[in-house]
Amino acid sequence: QYQLVKSMGEGLARVESAESVQPALVSIEDGWQIAYLLEPLENGWVTVFLPQAPTPMSGNVMYLPADRVRPLDITMVQAMAIVKHIGVGSAETLRGADLRLPAGAGA
């Protein structure tokens, strides 16, 4: 159990300090979900991690078209805090973010 907790803590520290990981919003049906943009793939696709509240390091990896992902101008610490606090405080952190849905979303 100690190794598992230690490994999760080390992973969290790596993600918080990783310059290549970008907080983002992912278009899901009629709304947005906070995500971590991990890397570009071929043909306009990207790899994202969708964290599950309230644990910022638990969730799912998804491969999506890049036009469904909107990078955010916030830090990883801020993005992880949104997840940890189950969205409370999002209004301040996401102030000024473009929340218009992509064309065809939710259709």
Task: Indicate where each model-derived feature is located.
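Membrane-targeting alpha-helical segments
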Residues: 1-4
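Glycine/threonine-rich ATP-lid/beta-loop region of ATP-binding domains
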Residues: 9-12
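Terminal membrane-proximal soluble interaction domains of membrane-associated proteins
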Residues: 16-107
